[in-house]
Amino acid sequence: MAAMDATPDTAPETYAGRLLAFTIPSRDARGRLVRLDSTLDEILAAHDYPPPITHLLAEALVLAVLMGGLVKDDGSQVTMQAQTEAGAVRLLVCDYKGGELRGYVDFDAARLAELGANPSLFALFGKGYLAITFDLARGKGRYQGIVPLEGDSLAEACERYFYQSEQVPTLIRCAVRSDGDGVRAAGLLVQHLAEGEEGRERLHTKLDHPEWEHVAILAGSLRHEELLDPALSLEAIAWRLFHEEEEVRVERGAAIARGCRCSVEHYREVLERFPEEDREDMRNEDGIVLVDCAFCSKQFGIEV
């Protein structure tokens, strides 16, 4: 039976709006759990998206938190971008930095309307790609992986990213629900730790390592209803999945909040990089440059 270690011992349980990290030392595995409620509603409220796009963005935001939670330095940022030249969705962007989350979708409304109520990932994007970028703090560098946007969901595409770009066996589960109380979304990410590969055959060439197979089977048993159950804490989910393990260490991560970083100062700095003749073309009749933030839908009037 597992020993659930938390730091500190008296830490409250986590239900929503905060990341939960866990490790299973005996299986060389780590994981992240998150459930979004009010923060998700706040982000979505900035846009008037139709249901398929709302569902897509909700899943993407969960994935951004799960992947961002793998980077321990609060100053680091993870950006997920899905793009195509032929689909109803032209661009999806989400990023996560130190608990701050934001995202938006650019899409063709007319083409989307032709797809029906529950379009597949391929119907939304056509032939596209998924780019995931880790900008590490303190000068530790920046790295990016790009994979085809394939599978039945964004979660499957992210699994493929970890397999192909980082050679890390990964299982991801996401769940999204819309009802009268708003939109709720949650996710689980479990990985085989790189340290577990030392002295063994590389897992990206042989994905049937018994430790990983065992963890993946347990994690894969998680139901969408459990992920979304507001009365079930994230610690309880980890316990249900892995209670037979020798030890499961859990740690509460960052609180999640909407975090758009747009500002007049930021846009002025960007505009000042343009030649004066270009800025003149941008100004309206009042001499103001109007800038729209795609993430939060605010409009800024910049004198520059």
Q: Can you describe what each PLM-predicted range is?
A:
Residues 2-251:
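Interaction interfaces in information-processing and related assembly proteins
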Residues 216-304:
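Cys/His-clustered metal-coordination modules, chiefly Zn-binding fingers
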